[in-house]
């Protein structure tokens, strides 16, 4: 009986997370950016690759259709990777949609975050504005990819970072350019284990600012499995300020390897990450991400779009 009890408890723990919401149609994605159009509520899903893939649907569950690319000719930023853009992040301000993207190559710190704008989110409607001025070189303590925008009052900030010294933030002059003289400051750092953090996404709820980020090995699962727990997963910290002071549920600083687990591998879901938060028209907060569905395949080309409505307890989110 004791052995059966242990097995039951193990299985219960392994299935502590809700499965992703339903998805039909073109459900592939990688480092997704999701937005709901203001005019009609239609959903647009953007993904890493080429000039940033665009899919759309009338419902989160789909069916999702492939609509083309944001920048089919690539970015005007003259760096390796200008035709293979990463990590779209979107917001809407004063009648315009802004999309941040990253230009880089795997393992390189020669990186830049660019921005494009549209009034409709549709393919063919986007204007590339090139670099925001948020750039890095091998001499930088950070890597300027995975940009994420947030506004606090009349100030705008861009969160960014991947590996190296992890996650940083810098103030923007507007939605297009970094503020003159602004210096990036560190938001989060993991000194433990394999150390990797990236894909910052910050949002506000009930007087708290929440910093979500992805940790662990992001890809290559078709070649080799990382050690258990070292695959991609999603963590969260919170603060009463958008510019720092983030701690996890145990009060451990995000600058000192803190971070409470929000979503990890479970069931057929492996390596969830590249996440963001969507506030839909019903004011519900939805966590979205990519994951490897072990029933389909482990390669990047097999990644799937995942989403879950967040649950809340004591102002901490769960899935």
Swiss-Prot record:
Checking Gene3D superfamilies in the record gives: Glycosyl hydrolase domain, family 43
In alphabetical order, the GO MF annotations are: arabinan endo-1,5-alpha-L-arabinosidase activity
User: What protein is this chain from?
Assistant: Probable arabinan endo-1,5-alpha-L-arabinosidase C
Q: What is the gene name?
A: abnC
Hey, which family's this protein in? Belongs to the glycosyl hydrolase 43 family.
Q: According to its UniProt record, which residues of this chain constitute the active site? A: 31 (proton acceptor), 198 (proton donor)
Q: What does this protein do?
A: Endo-1,5-alpha-L-arabinanase involved in degradation of pectin. Its preferred substrate is linear 1,5-alpha-L-arabinan.
First-level EC class: hydrolase
Origin superkingdom: Eukaryota
């Amino acid at each position: 009986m004791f052995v059966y009890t242990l097995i039951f408890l193990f299985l219960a723990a392994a299935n502590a997370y809700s499965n992703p919401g339903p998805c039909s149609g073109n459900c592939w994605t990688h480092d997704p950016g999701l937005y709901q159009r203001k005019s009609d509520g239609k959903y647009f899903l953007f993904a890493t690759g080429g000039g940033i893939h665009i899919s759309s649907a009338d419902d989160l569950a789909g069916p999702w259709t492939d609509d083309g690319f944001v920048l089919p000719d690539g970015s005007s930023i003259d760096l390796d990777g200008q035709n293979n853009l990463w990590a779209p992040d979107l917001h809407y301000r004063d009648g315009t949609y802004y999309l941040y993207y990253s230009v880089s190559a795997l393992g390189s710190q020669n990186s830049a975050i660019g921005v494009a704008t549209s009034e409709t989110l549709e393919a063919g409607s986007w204007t590339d504005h090139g670099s925001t001025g948020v750039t890095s070189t091998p001499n930088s303590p950070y890597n300027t990819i995975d940009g994420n925008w947030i506004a606090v009052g009349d100030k705008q900030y861009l969160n960014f970072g991947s590996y190296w010294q992890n996650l940083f933030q810098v103030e923007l002059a507007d939605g297009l350019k970094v503020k003159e003289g602004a210096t990036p400051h560190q938001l989060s750092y993991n000194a433990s284990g394999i150390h990797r953090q990236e894909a910052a996404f910050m949002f506000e709820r009930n007087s708290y600012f929440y910093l979500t980020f992805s940790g662990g090995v992001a890809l290559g699962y078709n070649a080799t499995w990382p050690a258990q727990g070292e695959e991609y997963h999603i963590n969260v910290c919170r603060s009463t300020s958008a510019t720092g002071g983030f701690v996890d549920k145990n009060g451990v600083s995000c600058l000192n390897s803190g971070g409470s687990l929000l979503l990890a591998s479970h069931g057929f879901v492996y390596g969830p990450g590249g996440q963001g938060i969507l506030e839909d028209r019903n004011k519900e907060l939805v966590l979205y991400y990519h994951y490897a569905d072990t029933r389909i395949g482990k390669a990047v080309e097999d990644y799937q779009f995942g989403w879950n409505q967040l649950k809340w307890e004591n102002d901490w989110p769960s899935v």
